[in-house]
Amino acid sequence: LPQAPKQDQNSVSPFFVIEADEYDTAFFDKRSKFVHYHPRTAVLNNLEFDHADIFDDLAAIEKQFHHLVRTVPQAGLVVSNGLEDSLQRVIAKGCWTPVEQFGSDSDWQAANPQSNGSFDVLFAGERQGHVAWDLLGEHNRMNALASIAAARHVGVSVKVAIEALSQFKNVKRRMEIRGEVHGVTVYDDFAHHPTAITTTVAGLRSKVGKARILAVLEPRSNTMKLGVMKNALPASLSEADLVFCYGADLGWDASTALAPIQHKAQVYNDLVSMVSAIVAAASSGDSVLVMSNGGFDGVHQKILDALTSKFSAE
């Protein structure tokens, strides 16, 4: 968070914000880490099957999320994504804390979204204000609604929350522009799950319109390396014009998985060849969207450097 204090700085604020972690606590405690947090305000944004190295199925993760919900006090608040069936099942297991939902047909809604990212905020059907920011995609609007609801619960007025979001600068590695060379823009995003890939590509598409998107993917997470999500990749990348996938060190064949979009997908097992192919394909007006939950061996700068060499030689 560019605008937040450094992690090692203590604040006089009584509030502490943490991203929940559903991985197991320790070898002797297989409960998810977040059952130890005991939050007063809990935001449940989305819940899908992931972390196949420790969870057998989605039901196992839902069970852990229900453990979390049960730790929120009666005077607290659960802010939940009303569009997620998995979260609806979690709440239905039993929740003794007030719940506010966000999303279409929910307590909190985003209305009149614009191509520049801005939108109106509705609560209980009443317009509360207008968020004027440049973050793209439905997932960012959902994040905004959740943060407004959570802030309201701890005493921040909706008006102030909306004003703060309008001044918000996006976090690192979320559609972060790493550079531009001769009209080719290189983005970096942490997306590594098919749903996140879908929303990230769709968000960029809403910004660039019909201009080309060159999606560059490293399936690096444990779940992706196991191949659990491989069949969902073609659909998640469908809005990209070209797809470059780094297939080294996978337990499955990326070319086979991407066969449904083979007309626009290329798989490489070495980074040098992949960067060369990306740069050869790129032209002015294109967006290169790099998606990985790791450093990807500095591929962003490699692409930018190679683009500089390409266009300076023309």
What are the functions of these language-model segments?
Residues 40-41, 66, 95-98, 111, ...:
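ATP-dependent carboxylate-amine ligase
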Residues 82-86, 104-105, 248-251:
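Short, polar loop motifs at secondary-structure junctions
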Residues 18-21, 44, 80, 188, ...:
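Active-site flanking residues adjacent to catalytic metal/cofactor-binding acidic residues
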Residues 72-76, 284-285:
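Short glycine-dipeptide loop
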Residues 64-72:
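Substrate-engagement module of ASCE P-loop NTPases
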Residues 27-30, 52-60, 224-226, 298-302:
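Glycine/threonine-rich flexible loop motifs
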Residues 74-78, 240-243:
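Short active-site oxyanion
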Residues 1-49, 88-130, 167, 172-174:
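Extended acidic/charged loop-beta regions that coordinate divalent cations
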